[in-house]
Amino acid sequence: MKAAEIREKFLKFFESKGHTIVRSSSLVPGNDPTLMFTNSGMVQFKDVFLGTDPRPYSRATTAQRSVRAGGKHNDLENVGYTARHHTFFEMLGNFSFGDYFKHDAIRFAWELLTTVYQLPKEKLWVTVYQEDDEAYDIWAKEVGVPTERIIRIGDNKGARYASDNFWTMGDTGPCGPCTEIFYDHGPDVWGGPPGSPEEDGDRYIEIWNLVFMQFNRDAQGNMTRLPKQSVDTGMGLERLAAVLQHVHSNYEIDLFQNLIKAAARVTEISDLTNNSLKVIADHIRACSFLIVDGVIPGNEGRGYVLRRIVRRAIRHGYKLGRKGSFFHKLVADLVAEMGAAYPELKEAEQRVTDVLRQEEERFFETIEHGMSILEAALADVEAKGGKVLDGELAFKLHDTYGFPLDLTADVCRERGMTVDEPAFDDAMARQREQARAAGKFKATQGLEYSGAKTTFHGYEEIAFDDAKVVALYVDGSAVNEVKAGQDAVVVLDHTPFYAESGGQVGDQGVLANAATRFAVADTLKVQADVVGHHGTLEQGTLKIGDVLRAEIDAHRRARTQRNHSATHLMHKALREVLGAHVQQKGSLVDAEKTRFDFAHNAPMTDDEIRRVEQIVNNEILANAPGIVRVMPYDEAVKGGAMALFGEKYGDEVRVLDLGFSRELCGGTHVHRTGDIGFFKIVVEGGVAAGIRRVEAITGDNAVRYVQELDARVNEAAAALKAQPSELTQRIAQVQDQVKSLEKELGALKSKLASSQGDELAQQATEIGGVYVLAATLDGADAKTLRETVDKLKDKLKSAAIVLAAVEGGKVSLIAGVTPDASKKVKAGELVNFVAQQVGGKGGGRPDMAQAGGTEPANLPGALAGVKGWVEERL
């Protein structure tokens, strides 16, 4: 039975039992920003189990795409060395949300395994939690499993309920016993039943885990029965397929065998048992589906985990002798295997291929040099009888050549060595500390404050009349007063000033009373809810307890708000035009522009930029109101609000509905989309691998930009004696004229070179049967120099020639040597001899080479030395 059929039978079986088939959720969890990847079937139902996400069904079944690489759950280092470890796997599961419980869960599992999949009953063993008499009795008395094949597992982790057969969601919350089903491969395979000293062998393999959410545990560890008891089960498709296909390794099942054959094809390897092929076959699944779900290779978070997996696969291809890109070619094979079950993979096939190809090409630029350094270092360690690679070297490979630590550790493991990871960590920590020290030091950084939080009025007001000074800082230290001319940070009890956060810059403005004026240049957070006003006291003396009028620069705030609101609309438009994989990676919103970094693997086309602009400007014309609501985080996310991974959100969040956009945002915004006025993208480019940057302007800035652009178009049209509407056609005509003139000029230069060649030939000096010539050809370009050298070689028959030209303070050099003389006089060495004297370098073939220089004053002397240099070699 093939893997695809096993998956289909599982889902159809539970559908026949009243379960709703629910599509696999994304590998990027949408309901838990703390979780790196979806690693089990229950992740998408977490809030359902907690009772905060009502669904129209009480029974569900899924085939969930899952990844275990990076973070707490990390199988990466074992992939390729064991029979059952994977970075990507499919978890088959059935779930009951307060519906059926132990009896039906156990009965369904037994029926599916023994009737649908027709596994021999005598091959199945089960475990239960030691205190779960109910589950034990169901297995023994209702299902009829012999008691000698039912094993009670007690508390084996040092505390009550700390057992392999007792599941918990966390330190508190839903928990309960579980029962696991094992398959016995028979006495020919070493290993003992679960709970025995030999349980780590391969004879008894766990295939299904049934979790019974029976209790709620409070902070004191007390257990109370849940009013609605639930079921969460998980069975790895790959493990089940291995059992049903009568093989002992997951890599021997049909799905993996097809991918392994494909990996062998693209790496040109015939030995299908090579472990590196297993690694590549496993990794193409994880990498492809992560990219499908919007993850892009990068240097942090999920992006870095993806990069590590890609580069590990590339390294194994390199180990097989593959020196060029190959990994991306497997995407089509993966689509053939899994595209029917997961149509999102087929839809994203080209994008996945492009992302992987770009990442491969980038790593192949450094892998060869890095591997040679690593191999030399390992050979040195072996020669000295050592077993540990220096962590500093591992860090150099990471920092300079892009080798993730686990890739280096992988190579060491193959040699029976390890990496000094503490030394690696120390080197990494030093680099981070240096980066922090070199970074911008904010005026509020490190300020000690223990007072009350600042009340923010800036959403509604641009000024606050009775703001009291509660803290003052000069040069990072708390003071009681500030004198005129001093730079300081002022903390108020109330303020309309927005502190820099979420990409939006802090407000500027004035704090003043009758005797005092403090100019605020920037507003920053001292603590999460404490606002620091950084600036200069222009007049008077400022003391703690003084009462001031705090007033922001309203014009600057309005322009900043327009840009911030436009950013929300642009983010949504980018996802509509480019795809749902677009995720914000950084932003800067100020009064002049909005700068937005996002995950995307290719430059935007002109048409895509125009479409984004059109969508945003249509939303502006619609003049929709901005609606702000404060609500629980979970409710906001369930309502479709976009949350950014890595951002820290409290229990209560601020949700902004603006036109067709809905995001979590604490920034300041326009009241209606029409207030933005006009939106224009002015810059699009790349800032890192897989990260694009767009800069856009709004309102009067955008109008001014278009007016200036229009003026330049009119100037260009006037210069070309054309109407603006005819500009493209007129430019094409001028380009044709330029090409024609360049062609004529080239012909004239060639003719000149021919005539000069005849004259130069007469200047050649014969040395040992070889004519030597070193001369300057005024006005010649590189092409003319080459043609002249070729003609001189034909004319002189046996020659060593150097010709030079000077233009704009730069020297161009061409050297040519006829075949009979090139064994003793190499053109590359000859041109380098001259180039080094004129401040340059160069090289090429033995018969023809070129170079450049920046010191034309030295050229006459350099050319004069050619004759002697050649004579020494003949």
Curated annotation (Swiss-Prot):
Zn(2+) binds at residues 564, 568, 665, 669. It is found in: Cytoplasm. Its EC number is 6.1.1.7. Keywords: Aminoacyl-tRNA synthetase, ATP-binding, Cytoplasm, Ligase, Metal-binding, Nucleotide-binding, Protein biosynthesis, RNA-binding, tRNA-binding, Zinc. One of its GO terms (cellular component) is cytosol. GO terms for biological process: alanyl-tRNA aminoacylation; negative regulation of DNA-templated transcription. It is an enzyme of class 6 (ligase). The keyword Amino-acid biosynthesis does not apply. Its cofactor is Zn(2+). One of its GO terms (molecular function) is tRNA binding. PROSITE patterns: AA_TRNA_LIGASE_II_ALA. SMART domains: tRNA_SAD. It catalyses: tRNA(Ala) + L-alanine + ATP = L-alanyl-tRNA(Ala) + AMP + diphosphate. Gene3D superfamilies: 2.40.30.130, 3.10.310.40, 3.30.54.20, 6.10.250.550, Bira Bifunctional Protein, Domain 2 (3.30.930.10), Threonyl-trna Synthetase, Chain A, domain 2 (3.30.980.10). Binds 1 zinc ion per subunit. NCBIfam families: alaS. Catalyzes the attachment of alanine to tRNA(Ala) in a two-step reaction: alanine is first activated by ATP to form Ala-AMP and then transferred to the acceptor end of tRNA(Ala). Also edits incorrectly charged Ser-tRNA(Ala) and Gly-tRNA(Ala) via its editing domain. Consists of three domains; the N-terminal catalytic domain, the editing domain and the C-terminal C-Ala domain. The editing domain removes incorrectly charged amino acids, while the C-Ala domain, along with tRNA(Ala), serves as a bridge to cooperatively bring together the editing and aminoacylation centers thus stimulating deacylation of misacylated tRNAs. PANTHER family: ALANINE--TRNA LIGASE, CYTOPLASMIC (PTHR11777:SF9), ALANYL-TRNA SYNTHETASE (PTHR11777). Belongs to the class-II aminoacyl-tRNA synthetase family. This is Alanine--tRNA ligase.
